[in-house]
Amino acid sequence: GHGIGSFLSVHEGPQKIAKNQGLSEGNIKEGMILSNEPGFYKEGEYGIRIENLIIVKRKSQTLLNFEVISWAPIDVDLIEFSLLTYDEIKWINWYHQEVFNKLSDKLNNKEKTWLFKVTQPIS
């Protein structure tokens, strides 16, 4: 993940979390916002990335954790269900329930109907 910008660049630092790309230029600190964007890429064919924004929160005196601050449904039409584990299906269903719970009261009826449809549990 990377820091989020509003005027300079969408990839603003100094914070970042990246495999094989070195350490962050600065410490991760409470209140920082980063992207969380796991993905899969098949070389020369296709790729998919699911991205959310997370904020760094203090969990204890010595431990920080992340809290999702951008909630959007995942397009399940892009998922090959036979490749998912039980825990992955369970997580998608939990995530979609959270999306609906956090957003539905801010939507009009048409929008809420759409959100309800796209956040239905998968199996």
Where are these regions (language model features)?
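Core alpha/beta catalytic barrel or barrel-like domain that forms the active/cofactor pocket
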Residues: 1-7
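Charged, cofactor-coupling segments
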Residues: 7-123
